[in-house]
Curated annotation (Swiss-Prot):
Excises uracil residues from the DNA which can arise as a result of misincorporation of dUMP residues by DNA polymerase or due to deamination of cytosine. This is Uracil-DNA glycosylase. The active site is at D65 (proton acceptor). Keywords: Cytoplasm, DNA damage, DNA repair, Hydrolase. Belongs to the uracil-DNA glycosylase (UDG) superfamily. UNG family. The keyword Hydrolase applies. One of its GO terms (molecular function) is uracil DNA N-glycosylase activity. It comes from Bacillus thuringiensis (strain Al Hakam). GO terms for cellular component: cytoplasm. The keyword DNA damage applies. Its EC number is 3.2.2.27. It catalyses: Hydrolyzes single-stranded DNA or mismatched double-stranded DNA and polynucleotides, releasing free uracil. Its main location: cytoplasm.
Length: 225
């Protein structure tokens, strides 16, 4: 599962692929993909980094592990492939977006438009076995994605980290550079959204920060497909 990242993440993350933890992860993944159905497809594992280069990252929305149902995951946190029903957490994200900006809820959950504008949609674990949430937890991905966060933390140009829920907020310890911004609330999951996600206005907070920095704001509206 070694991968040549075609943008500026390539040289930054190349040392990770040579480390012992990644070699063990690689052996595990080759076996998993050969005997089980694993998501996303091998060629989509690193899509978050492919769509959003290091230099172009303005915002990070941290997820946990990929969706584990058929045709959902394609390497971007919270996003699903076209033609697939919008999952409940993403639907709540859209409801909050509607309340903030008045956008209609789109007929899809395909968030590539965000990624192309500099929103890094990063899961902390990048693969999962079909139907088994967290099945690839603790196999090595966390070391890899922690390094992604650490590299962004080292950047002088500010990054806005959106941390929803305790799992994402546990990564706050990696964000030590005071140049960066953290926006946090409970998770948009139906289990917690009414306890502080709805009304938290994350999208307009991001754009206020970007505007104050003289950066182009994110156009959060997802078009119908």
């Amino acid at each position: 599962m070694k991968h040549v990242l075609k943008n500026d993440w390539g040289p930054l993350l190349a040392p990770e692929f040579e480390k012992e933890y990644y070699r063990e992860l690689d052996v595990f993944l080759k076996e998993e993909y050969s005997i089980h159905v694993v998501y996303p497809k091998i060629e989509d594992i690193f899509n978050a980094l492919e769509y959003t280069s290091y230099e172009n990252t303005k915002v990070v929305i941290l997820g946990q592990d990929p969706y584990h149902g058929p045709n959902q995951a394609h390497g971007l946190s919270f996003s699903v492939q076209p033609g697939v029903k919008t999952p409940p957490s993403l639907l709540n994200m859209y409801k909050e977006l509607r309340d903030e900006y008045g956008y209609d809820i789109p007929n899809n959950g395909y968030l590539v438009k965000w990624a192309e504008q500099g929103v890094l949609l990063l899961n902390t674990v990048l693969t999962v076995r079909q139907g088994e949430a967290n099945s690839h937890k603790g196999k090595g991905w966390e070391h890899f994605t922690d390094r992604v966060i650490e590299l962004l933390n080292e950047r002088e140009k500010p990054v806005i980290f959106i941390l929803w829920g305790r799992h994402a907020q546990a990564k706050k310890k990696l964000i030590t550079n005071s140049n960066h911004h953290i926006i946090e609330s409970v998770h948009p999951s139906p289990l917690s959204a009414r306890r502080g996600f709805f009304g938290s206005k994350p999208y307009s907070k991001v754009n206020t920060i970007l505007a104050n920095m003289g950066e182009r704001e994110i156009d959060w509206e997802i078009p119908n497909l």
